[in-house]
Amino acid sequence: MQSVIAQAKRIVVKVGSSLVTNDGKGLDHDAIARWAAQIAKLRVAGKEVVLVSSGAIAEGMQRLGWVRRPKEIHELQAAAAVGQMGLAQVYESQFGRYGIRTAQVLLTHADLADRERYLNARSTLLTLLSLGVVPIINENDTVVTDEIKFGDNDTLGALVTNLIEGDALVILTDQRGLYTADPRKDPAAQFVDEALAGTPELEAMAGGAGTSIGRGGMLTKILAAKRAAKSGAHTTIASGREANVLERLAAGEAIGTQLLAPTGRLTARKQWMADHLQLRGRVVIDNGAVEKLTSGGKSLLPIGVTEVQGEFARGEVIACVDAQGKEVARGITNYSSAEARLIARKPSSEIESVLGHLNEPELIHRDNLVLV
């Protein structure tokens, strides 16, 4: 088995908090120097690399003299603001030793949910890569409260992979890779060398919490691989403690767990829809509509909608869920939530008489709909 990284031309590397900090006590400059050296060699080998790095909050805690990670959102935001300065400085210094320029890019979920901002971010990152710059990306912890409380950079790594149409995502952690159970609790746990990304069995294998400094457990990495696979990118989950792990992966050595993407990828527009993390509304659809969407590749008509939940405007991305609340698809709605409530369960021929106008005969056209 050969590493999928060997054939990848555009790679997103996510480095966790434990791999760039001294047990949460500020940044580990020596470790960051080693990451810079390895990425520099990948660049020489002709690969484009985007780095997603944690560590801002841990560095901020060190600079502010805080021993324990605070629980208050505003204190976490303050630590992130202070720490981001140090994180950017260290990376700039270490990459500069190899004549490589770096760029700091701070993103929020909102940046990727808005279509225009999404395209702007994509253009910026692709331009930086064309200029030979290594973008160093982090979530903008200072302004996004829900990211600090619930988010993780594994998800961000997958989103960035899809954003730039990367070939592979490498998630480096303090674990060897994926096991069938938590090896710290179950001595019978088996290591998983390779699997198909996005299967329910993988999610069942994944454990929960991570370390006290980082926020992501193995489940977030499994879900990140599932998300990246939608754009055709393979994911490798490996230990960042392995010597020269990036160089060895690029040379073809199989290290860690490889989660392979199924054949085929979503179009860029449908990938953008699939990557929405926060949706303002959803529609409950009947079994007939579920069948038409999942098997027939049809559009969603108002007659198949049994309930409208949340408040949304025309042109927003909404979820389509079955009677049990399971999301089966999402897409761009042709009608607002208020309009959708009026035309739900009605044939398309009655839309104009009910609303006084007809935008489209479909609530969501199949070209603007993606299965999840």
Swiss-Prot record:
Its main location: cytoplasm. Keywords: Amino-acid biosynthesis, ATP-binding, Cytoplasm, Kinase, Nucleotide-binding, Proline biosynthesis, Transferase. Gene3D superfamilies: Acetylglutamate kinase-like, PUA domain. It is found in: Cytoplasm. Its EC number is 2.7.2.11. GO terms for molecular function: ATP binding; glutamate 5-kinase activity; RNA binding. One of its GO terms (biological process) is L-proline biosynthetic process. One of its GO terms (cellular component) is cytosol. CDD domains: AAK_G5K_ProB, PUA_G5K. Belongs to the glutamate 5-kinase family. This is Glutamate 5-kinase. It comes from Cupriavidus necator (strain ATCC 17699 / DSM 428 / KCTC 22496 / NCIMB 10442 / H16 / Stanier 337). The gene is proB.
